[in-house]
Swiss-Prot record:
GO (cellular component) term, any one: cell outer membrane
Protein name: SusD-like protein P38
Compartment(s) where it occurs, according to its Swiss-Prot or TrEMBL record: Cell outer membrane
Gene3D superfamilies: 1.25.40.390
Top-rank taxon: Bacteria
SUPFAM superfamilies documented for this protein: TPR-like (SSF48452)
Signal peptide location: 1-21
Taxonomic source organism: Formosa agariphila (strain DSM 15362 / KCTC 12365 / LMG 23005 / KMM 3901 / M-2Alg 35-1)
Keywords (A to Z) from UniProt: Cell outer membrane, Coiled coil, Membrane, Signal
Lineage: Bacteria, Pseudomonadati, Bacteroidota, Flavobacteriia, Flavobacteriales
Family: Belongs to the SusD family.
Job description of the protein: Polysaccharide-binding protein probably involved in ulvan degradation. Ulvan is the main polysaccharide component of the Ulvales (green seaweed) cell wall. It is composed of disaccharide building blocks comprising 3-sulfated rhamnose (Rha3S) linked to D-glucuronic acid (GlcA), L-iduronic acid (IduA), or D-xylose (Xyl). The SusD-like protein may mediate ulvan oligomer-binding before transport in the periplasm for further degradation.
InterPro entries with a match to the protein in the record: SusD-like_N, SusD_RagB_dom, TPR-like_helical_dom_sf
Amino acid sequence: MKKFKNISITFLILISLGVLNSCESVLEVEPESSISDEQFWKTNEDAKLGLAAAYDALQKAYRTKRFYWGEFRADNYVNSEKPQPDTQDLINNNLTPESSTEYLQWDEFYSLIFRANLAIEKIPEIPYYDTQYLGEAYALRAFAYFDAYRVWGGVPLFTKAELTFSDDAIKPRSSAQEVLDLVLSDIEEAEKNLTVVSSDYTFSKLSLLAFKAQVHMYLNEYEAANTALTSLIASNQFSLTTNRKQWRDLFLNDEINYPGEGQEGPELIMSIRYDFEEDGNRASGIYQVFFPGVPSYYVAPNLVEEWETKFPTDSTAWATKYPNVPPHVFEENEDTGELNAKYGDYRYYESIAAPGTQEEDLRISKYHKVNISPSIDDTNIILFRYADMLLLKAEALNQLGQPTEAIELVNQIREARELPLVNSGTIPDVVNINDKDELEDFILSERRLELLAEGYRWWDLVRTNKAVEVMGPINGLTQDRIIWPLWFRHLIDNPKLEQNVPY
């Protein structure tokens, strides 16, 4: 995918949007060859190269934003003694239009949208064009606009590749509903055109089903979400990992402790791929965001408490709750080579580490186990994973009045993770499966543990209308501040933009 990424397709210009500084700071990609628009889009190979440019923009747009948007406004983290503005404003619910460009600036998103627009315009002009490429372009545009919808609500809506300076290029915000309507329409167009069943790093029929399910779950459209999830699961293309190493290898990119391991597994539906040799320094943003040398945040104590209450790490507490369940976590004694039992959930030990001398110095260790320079980071970002899909389906089934089937899906994951089944201990899980609200909270808790540091928790709280309930007592979040502010510079550069209330 990426080896073609440095070939420029056209002289790319978008003004206004508040993307950069008026006429002198347009959104542009300098042409590296003299190939013109008219000369280029002639063959399916050209279409493939054009899409490579769009996926390159996807890499840049999501390298840190996926985590700043989906993780740090939720209850998984607390500030450290040396907080940094990037995360402090998020954790404290102190967002302003002057907050970090890491999560408020939308330049790279419109670069992605422009490149998708260009492909959507030009591919149908190619004789005997491959509809797969057109489907990918629609899927990429839908993906970008859906996140814009979740973050800002209404945004300037571009459906054509604007190539000239004109008044039409300076647009006000469309309504949130108009943005959502385009997302849903683009998903339909992608469905009509995609032909590839599955692909690790590009949109396919199955990754589109995963995306479609996420969209409908966000909109509380449970029948539609369940239909998409049923089709995805019935494909039998994906399965759960069944041991600690397999689960760890889904995420791990740690050449110091685990050279040559990780970034693969049967649960991965689609990821954004990064490669240091192809993409250069700081290609991915995971090392930058998680496990930094001087942490600006720690894993929240209430998350640790929730995890250890469900799956005790103390042998006595485990034996009390699960007297007939032996531990499945073992670690080798470095001196004797003996395997010693550890109690609890191996996901806990793989996801959280305490490298410092203080017990509360807990950091995310899901992707790497020690501090590694962000300059060499090429960790893939997982967009869709099978366990996420099963838990979404469990949620949907609960809302559709099928709690027993919902618990069966939760137990599929528990069994795969070598954990006791729901309500199997002498101290039952705190859930009445016949109470829809209780079961929803329980499934969200299972998601919190399984999907930690993957960019889901904040959006889970928002889509289930629990953001204020959970975060209000922690940082004073109110309903009107769930939406994000527009970056102040975008408002200066485009006077037609209006700021979100109450910012």
